[in-house]
Design a protein with these regions (language model features):
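Core segments of cupin and vicinal oxygen chelate
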Residues: 8-57
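Exposed loop/turn and edge beta-strand positions of beta-sandwich/beta-sheet ligand-binding modules
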Residues: 3, 57, 108
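Conserved beta-strand in the GNAT
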Residues: 61-63, 122-123
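Short acidic/glycine-enriched loop/turn segments that link adjacent beta-strands
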Residues: 35-39, 71-73, 105-110
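Vicinal oxygen chelate
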Residues: 4-12, 30-32, 64-137
């Protein structure tokens, strides 16, 4: 099985969204800046020295800026896969639609989004060898 390892939510105002989730749930945020697409890493629970959740089954996530040229902007999950190309093939064969080509996220792995058969926006990531072994970026 391939586990859900991350969640993502779009934002119009990252400062406002970070403040909301910090105040409401105590989540912590790390702003990555323009060189990483103004992505915000979100920690939802205590993590170990490798930035992995200490609570089994728990996941962290991120916020990304909404953009007029990207129509699929709503909360989604990220599934870890061993072989992103093989998973892309399986998605297409099962009736889903892969959105573009995988992009490399430095230190993390290959990432791509897709629509399932019900139109849900989901993403998947093939982690780097370092991430698979418990290392972090």
């Amino acid at each position: 099985m391939n586990p859900v390892v991350h969640f993502e939510m779009p934002t119009q105002d990252k400062q406002r969204m970070v403040a909301f989730y910090a105040k409401t749930f105590g989540w912590k945020a790390q702003m990555l800046g323009p060189e990483m697409g103004d992505y915000v890493l979100v920690t939802t629970m205590e993590t170990d020295q490798n930035s992995r959740p200490k609570t089994p089954g728990a996941i962290n996530g991120g916020f990304y800026p909404k953009s007029a040229d990207k129509p699929a902007q709503y909360p989604s999950v990220v599934v870890a896969v061993d072989d992103i190309r093989d998973s892309m093939r399986k998605i297409t064969e099962a009736g889903g639609k892969v959105l573009g080509e995988p992009m490399e996220i430095p230190g993390y792995g290959l990432y791509i989004s897709f629509f399932d058969t019900e139109g849900n926006h989901v993403s998947m990531m093939e982690p780097t060898a370092q991430m698979k072994s418990g290392g972090h970026g």
